[in-house]
Every structure is written in C-alpha cells, then in structure tokens.
Amino acid sequence: MENLNALILGIIEGLTEFLPVSSTGHMILGTTILGIDIDEFWKSFLIIIQLGSILAVIFVFWRKLFQGLDIWLKLAAGFFPTGVIGLFVAKYLNALFNGWVVVGMLIFGGVVFILIELAHKNKQYRINSLEEISFKQAFCIGIFQSLAMIPGTSRSGASIIGGLLLGFNRKVAAEFSFLLAIPTMIIATAYSIYKEPELLSNANSLIPLGIGFITAFVVAVLVIKFFLKFISKFDFIPFGIYRIILGFVFFYLYYSGILNAGSEFKL
C-alpha cells in the first residue's frame, strides 16, 4: 500500500468511525476510488487504523474512565448483549455482506435520525449525564449497538439512536456511544485476530501502518471533540440527510455498475 493511500484511509477512518454515518460505507468508497486491492495486508491495515481510533476515545475520555468503577460496569452491561448476539449471529452475517444492504441501511438510518429529532423537538431529556444512566439503560443501548452488525448501519449511529429513544440528551448519547466503542472494538479486533492470526504476520509494512494509525488517531480525536461541541448546539438532522444522500450515491454506483454490489463490498 502506498503511503499516500494509507494517509487517506487513515483520514477516512478517523472522520467516520465515530460519526453516525457508517465508516464501512466510506471505507468501501475510499478503497474503490483509490483502486486498492482488498488483500490480506489491507485487512491487517484496517485493524491497525481502528486501533488508532480506539486510542483516540481513550485519550479524549481518560478522565471519565478513571473516575471510578461505575462507568466500567455500565460499559460492561452495554457490551454484554452485543457480545452475546454477535457470538450467535456472526456466522450468518456473510449473507448480509452486500452493497444493497448498505444502501438500505444508510437511507433507513438517515430517516430514523430525522424522525427522532422531529419527534423530540421540544421534549425534555431525562438523562443529562453519564452518571444518571442506569445499568438497564446501558444494557438496552448494547442491544441497539448490536444492530450495527448489519453493514451500513453505523455502530455509533445505532447506539446514539438507542440513547435518544431512552431519553438521553444528545451529548450523553454520543459520549456513551463513544465510550462503549472501547470494549466493543477492542474485543471485536481481538476476535478477528483469533480467527485469522495470520493478520498480524501480514502487518509487515510498518511505514503505511504507522501513517494510517497516527492519522486515524489524530483525526478521530479532532472529530470527537468537534462532534460533541456540535451536538451541544445542533441536532442530528444534518447527519440524517447526509446518510440519505450517501445512500443514493451508493444506489447509483451499484445500479450503474460502477461498483459491484457483491464482491467489492466484501471487506
């Protein structure tokens, strides 16, 4: 992989991993436009840049993470349903690895965001801090997060929608979604390596790996901070609109044959 491509993919990962817009969809687009072969090194590269994004969350929220055991117990409660559901359905997920599924989930998720915001326009939120989240609510967020196993859904999008429906204010919904990414992404990465241990041996080009990792980390830190400030003042409707537009872009690319809805989606 060329260093410039590693930089661009690191930027894409950092920009989209924690925004409710589907990082998978953007990775498909970026990889295709750059003409990158989806080989074993690419899979290893993807794992490394995702680790950069995870480190970004830890960097931004380290104070909250070390305030006490309570937040970790809530994250455990949130991860539990995702982990259990993942173990049971993982072997069936390949059937969903299709570009048309991405199109449908991008558009559907965008519509849901818009409808939720319109329904909650003047509603008072019940949960205004991480400390107010109950273990039951954290568990429910984990159930919503498990929907992100469907390609194009967006892990952060699914968990944020769950938070909004449970009465979290926008910032708390986003913060808990970001924090829940830590155990979710670390364990998902470990599971991928367990299934394919050769992924580590394929990670032998240190310069592009380092560029991708550092870029994803720096961009993700900036995006997380910007996003939290943005949603403190505005709603999620712009992200809903963006998802719908992106969904129709993919629809055109697949329908016109520019992208292959089957093979090119299999990341």
From Swiss-Prot:
Broadest EC class assigned to this enzyme: hydrolase
UniProt-listed Enzyme Commission number(s): 3.6.1.27
Record InterPro entries: UppP
GO terms of biological process kind: cell wall organization; peptidoglycan biosynthetic process; regulation of cell shape; response to antibiotic
Catalytic activity entry: di-trans,octa-cis-undecaprenyl diphosphate + H2O = di-trans,octa-cis-undecaprenyl phosphate + phosphate + H(+)
Transmembrane segments: 7-29, 41-61, 69-89, 96-116, 173-193, 207-227, 239-259
Pfam family name, one: BacA
Subcellular location: Cell inner membrane
GO molecular function: undecaprenyl-diphosphatase activity
Protein topology in the membrane: Multi-pass membrane protein
Record's keyword terms, sorted: Antibiotic resistance, Cell inner membrane, Cell membrane, Cell shape, Cell wall biogenesis/degradation, Hydrolase, Membrane, Peptidoglycan synthesis, Transmembrane, Transmembrane helix
GO cellular component: plasma membrane
UniProt xrefs under PANTHER family: UNDECAPRENYL-DIPHOSPHATASE (PTHR30622:SF3)
Entry function: Catalyzes the dephosphorylation of undecaprenyl diphosphate (UPP). Confers resistance to bacitracin.
Other comments on record: Bacitracin is thought to be involved in the inhibition of peptidoglycan synthesis by sequestering undecaprenyl diphosphate, thereby reducing the pool of lipid carrier available.
Record-stated family: Belongs to the UppP family.
Name used for this protein in its record: Undecaprenyl-diphosphatase
Taxonomic placement: Bacteria, Pseudomonadati, Campylobacterota, Epsilonproteobacteria, Campylobacterales
